Regions:
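Extracytosolic ligand-binding ectodomains
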Residues: 1-109
């Protein structure tokens, strides 16, 4: 993975758990927990409505970069990935930089 934050996360995950994290959901799950932690701290309470409002109103520093939500949706994400030379790379996304060109495989048109 070319992104330094995700590479650091993957290394720490493997050191702590002894298992290699998957290339799709693991960092997403960790980012969601980072958002929740920051929202609780920002809200200063565990009250569901207050924490929810903090998530709606703020941008959060996560392993996947700065994330925010509009109408309950984050518009920053990778939607398609492809294995290339043993590395899982993002090839299509929304508001993300660094997409690798899609490599057509033999027989693809």
């Amino acid at each position: 993975v070319d992104d330094p934050k995700i590479a650091e996360y993957r290394k720490a995950h493997e050191e702590i758990t002894g298992s290699v994290p998957d290339y799709w959901a693991s960092a997403n799950t960790y980012a969601a927990l980072q958002i929740l932690e920051q929202a609780i701290v920002g809200a200063g309470t565990l009250d569901k409505e207050t924490v929810t409002q903090d998530i709606k109103d703020n941008t959060f520093d996560t392993v996947k970069g700065d994330l925010s939500f509009k109408n309950n949706f984050s518009n920053t994400f990778w939607s398609v990935g492809q294995w290339q030379d043993g590395v899982f790379r993002g090839v299509k996304g929304s508001n993300v930089d660094g997409a690798a060109p899609v490599r057509l495989k033999d027989g693809w048109k």
